C-alpha cells in the first residue's frame, strides 16, 4: 500500500512500478501507480479537508509543521540512507539534503510573517488592512534530484498558509516520497490535508487536469514545465509556479588563485553528478595564458573524480546518476557535441555496464556553430573562450534560459556590470552556481521559470492577498460629494 489518501494507506490501481538502486541494481521499492480515479479521490479528500485546515490559526498549523521538523531530526539517519540509496548520491550529500529540510521549517515560518502576514494602517475614518488567504487545493510535483528538499520547499509553506495538497513524487524516487509522507502522518496531519499519489506521466497528467484544483507547484525540467503551462493556459484562476532548468553560464575572468577557481568550478558543474538545475553547463573562459593554465588544471583535477556507491568509504565526491538511461543520455550528448566539431578535453566514461556511475566530461566548443541551447542534466561541461568582458556577457545571455549565472573575478566593477546586464534569477560572484540560501528567492526567468521563485518567496505563491477598508461604525460624512442632497426638504 503506497498511496496515502484521506488518512489511509491504499494500493494503487495503476501500473506496477519497481525502483532499483541505480548503481547496484538492488530492488528498493515496489508498488502501483495511482489511476485517474484515485487521483480524483485524493482531490476530493483535499477539498473536504480544506475548510477546517484553513480555519485553524497559524499557531495551530505551525504546531504540526514543527512536529514534522522534530521527526525529521529524529529520523535523519534513516531518511538520509533512503534518499542516498534511491538517487545514487553519496551519503554525505543526502545528509545535507535532510538538514536543509529541517532548516526549511523555521525559515518558512519566518517567511510567512514577512511575506504574507497581516498589516494594518490607520486612516482618518478607519483603517486599511492586508491579510492573506490560502488558495485551496494545490498539486505539488516533486523532482528526483532532491526528492526530499525540493518538494518540502513547496509543501511546508503551502501547509502553513492553510492549503491542502496532493503530492506526486517523481516516478524515479517513490521510496523517498513515501518515507517523507510517513513522517507527515506521524506528525498528526488531519486526514486529507496532505495526500500522496505515486506514478509517472499518466498519473501526472490526471493530476494536472483536475478541474477542482486551485494551483500547481512544480520543480523539474523545462519540457515538463512547458507542457504544464500549456495545459493550464486559459485558466487564470489557478496559480502555477514553475521552477525549471537552466543552461547556466559561469564566467572565469582574471583569477589570483587557480586552484580556488577550479574548486568553485567543480562545485558548480559536477556536484550531485551534475544533476542540479543551477549547475554550470557553459564555462566562459577568458582567452590567454592564465585561462590555458586554469583549463589544464580543471581537467587534471576533474580527471581524479571517481564516482562511487552511496555508502563507499571513503566517501566519493559524486555518486551515480538517477538511472543508467540518464547516464547514457549524457554520453550521447557529448558524442553529438564532438561530432559537431567540439574538442574533447575530458571524455565522460561509464565505469560499469548497467549502472549509472559516470565520470565527468569537459568539451571545448569555441567556434562551433549551431550548438543546441539545451540543458544536459549531468556531469558534462562545455567550454567557450572569450576576449572581452562585454563579449562574455553577450555569450552568457545567449540562451532562452535564465536560472543562474556566475562570475569569478577580483573586480567588483565587473560584477556590478553583470548585475545590470545578466538575464538570470541568480547571479553569484566568486561563489558556486550551486550555492543557494533559503533566506533569498530561488528561481529564474525565461525558460527557467514563470517569475514565481521559491525558497524565501515560496510564501508568495501559497496565498493570495486580501485588502480591506474597515471602520467599526458608520456615520454620514460631514462633507458630501457634489450633487448629493440629504436635507429634509421635499423635492417638488
UniProtKB/Swiss-Prot annotation:
Pathway the protein acts in: Amino-acid degradation; L-arginine degradation via AST pathway; L-glutamate and succinate from L-arginine: step 4/5
Active site: 243, 277
Reactions catalysed according to its record: N-succinyl-L-glutamate 5-semialdehyde + NAD(+) + H2O = N-succinyl-L-glutamate + NADH + 2 H(+)
Sequence positions that bind NAD(+): 220-225
Keyword Oxidoreductase on entry: yes
Example GO biological process: arginine catabolic process to glutamate
Record-linked SUPFAM superfamilies: ALDH-like
GO molecular function annotations of the record: aldehyde dehydrogenase [NAD(P)+] activity; succinylglutamate-semialdehyde dehydrogenase activity
InterPro entries found in the cross-reference section: Ald_DH/histidinol_DH, Ald_DH_C, Ald_DH_CS_CYS, Ald_DH_CS_GLU, Ald_DH_N, Aldehyde_DH_dom, SuccinylGlu_semiald_DH_AstD
EC id: 1.2.1.71
Cited CDD domains: ALDH_SGSD_AstD
Listed HAMAP family: Aldedh_AstD
Function in brief: Catalyzes the NAD-dependent reduction of succinylglutamate semialdehyde into succinylglutamate.
Assigned protein family: Belongs to the aldehyde dehydrogenase family. AstD subfamily.
Record-given protein name: N-succinylglutamate 5-semialdehyde dehydrogenase
Annotated source species: Escherichia coli (strain 55989 / EAEC)
